[in-house]
Amino acid sequence: VTTRSSLEADLAARLDSATEARWMVEEVLGRRAAREHAVSDAVVEAVAAMADRRLAGEPLQYVLGTWAFRTLELTVDPRVLIPRPETEHVVEVALRQLRDTAPSRRDASGPIVADLGTGSGAIALSIAAEVDDVIVWATDADRDALAVAAQNRARVGATRPEVAERVRLRMGDWVDWFGALPATLEGGIDLVVTNPPYVSALEWIDLEPSLHQEPRSALVADDGSDGTPGFAAVEAVLRDGHGWLVPGGSVVVEIAEHQAHAARTLAGALGYRDVRVERDLAGRDRVFVGRR
């Protein structure tokens, strides 16, 4: 008889990772199954198929089909980028800016946030889950990615419907980053937050192979008008974003380390105030912040 314990042990040896083995078994069996719980042939086959995919080089998050991001468990598959710790830090910075900005609103409504290029919905849903009265407009230019965001909104909504109903999904495009938003929001957004494509086409070639399995359109951007590699999307958000923010509203953008100088320079020219770049957990310039 195959038990959960023996299945995990066999899988750990095959994957050379006890942690990944445990996660795969938990994904199929659930976390509450006892160590000596007898498992069916169907479970053994399902776990073996996951191991095959992992050994073929597929990212662990796609193999599992779910991944934790801050307080949420999200559906993740090859239609969207894998949520990363750097982006959790982006949310942390965004929440801090929102706490500082929102009290300046003249009306009694809660803060309004735009998450551009939402992908899995990780940023939008996290902000909605952690700020009680916020409305988050989440856009993406990729229909498949937006479908994953909708799945995750439903997933969160199954236990926290009040969170899901405050996230509005909109189909956008790569040319006009703000075009999917209702025109009535222009000049009225408290926070624009985004993890846009910021890898240049040349840089993409040299990325580790597993990153090539993630959607290229969510990673790769043209160079900026000043020649900064991969900067075009960040530049577009900064150029257009100023007019969409309320006075005192913030823009928070995940960037590549080498784009910090270009982002600061452009933001200064566009009239942003309190411009800074925060470092990620590895000490790299990663999160651009500015106020209207």
Task: Locate predicted features.
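A general structural signal for well-ordered alpha-helical segments in protein cores
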Residues: R4, E8, A21, V47, ...
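Hydrophobic alpha-helical packing residues
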Residues: L11, L95, I127, R153-V156, ...
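Short, solvent-exposed loop/helix junctions and linker helices
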Residues: A18, D41-V44, L81-P85, G227-F231, ...
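Glycine-rich, flexible loop/turn motifs
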Residues: R35, A56-G65, L72, D77, ...
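SAM-dependent Rossmann-like transferase core, predominantly class I methyltransferases
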Residues: A49-A150, M171, W177-A180, V289
